[in-house]
């Protein structure tokens, strides 16, 4: 919407992919995937589809450009900006941003660096959920965490590129006194002939020859 002229322009239609959450099943309008930020000159906005970033001309006169060059859709990974104390909504041409790449097939997550030319650089990746807490004022160091079923979300300290990581807390030492568990990704075909995915949690001493009670959660 142009406040000066009152003109409304659809700036995302030419992208060719839905900009809303297609799988949304609530009795309400589906939410948009959202906005990643803006260019410093104020002429473009970065929008998300299910996988990638799009650089979109606010006037609608120029064709949208896929900043991430379709990498997310090609590899089945959702690329999103990660939060931290240095997060910006406005990006200069020479800036980089830390993004997460969540693999929709394996459920693994990666932390990458994305520049404004669309180049991605992998910093770390694995069967974890990652969170960034703070970068140092000089942007040389970072505090972050990772977690999964077997690893508690302790704090880690590293260089800003996440190299040479050192765990600095041990918040859940009592975990070592208990039998814990494992998890694996399972897939099946539902009654609509569509593939579903789920996480199967097993006890630490699981014996496939025995029967166990099962709890199932659908969401």
Residue ranges and their predicted role:
Residues 1-3, 37-38, 44-52, 57-58, ...:
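Beta-strand C-termini and the immediately following turn/loop, strongest in propeller blades
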Residues 131-219:
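Serine-hydrolase catalytic core recognition
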Residues 1-32, 46-54, 73, 101-110, ...:
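A flexible loop/linker signature enriched in serine peptidases of the S9 family
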Residues 113-116, 122-136, 142:
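Extended, charged coiled-coil "arm/hinge" scaffolds of SMC/Rad50-like chromosome-maintenance ATPases
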Residues 2, 6-9, 62-69, 111-123, ...:
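Surface-exposed loop/turn elements that mediate protein-protein interactions on large endomembrane-trafficking
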Residues 29-30, 38, 126, 178-181, ...:
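Short solvent-exposed loop/turn micro-motifs enriched in small/polar/acidic residues
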Residues 8, 35, 43-45, 52-54, ...:
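Beta-sheet entry/capping signal
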Residues 6-30, 67-89, 170-184:
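Surface-exposed loop and turn segments in beta-propeller and other repeat-based domains
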């Amino acid at each position: 919407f142009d406040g000066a002229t009152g003109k409304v322009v659809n700036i995302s239609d030419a992208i060719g992919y839905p900009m809303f959450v297609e799988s949304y099943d609530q009795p309400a309008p589906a939410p948009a995937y959202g906005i990643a930020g803006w260019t410093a000159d104020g002429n473009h906005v970065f929008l998300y589809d299910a996988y990638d970033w799009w650089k979109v001309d606010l006037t609608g006169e120029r064709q949208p450009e896929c900043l991430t060059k379709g990498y997310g859709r090609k590899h089945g990974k959702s690329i999103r900006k990660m939060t931290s104390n240095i997060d910006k909504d406005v990006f200069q041409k020479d800036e980089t941003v830390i993004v997460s790449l969540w693999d929709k097939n394996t459920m693994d997550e990666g932390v990458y660096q994305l520049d404004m030319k669309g180049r991605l650089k992998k910093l770390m990746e694995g069967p974890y959920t990652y969170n960034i807490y703070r970068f140092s004022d000089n942007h040389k160091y970072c505090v972050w965490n990772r977690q999964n079923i077997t690893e508690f979300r302790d704090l880690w300290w590293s260089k800003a590129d996440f190299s040479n990581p050192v765990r600095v807390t041990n918040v859940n030492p009592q975990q070592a006194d208990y039998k814990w568990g494992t998890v694996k990704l399972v897939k099946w075909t539902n009654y609509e002939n569509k593939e579903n995915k789920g996480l199967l949690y097993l006890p630490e001493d699981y014996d496939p020859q025995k029967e166990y009670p099962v709890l199932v959660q659908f969401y």
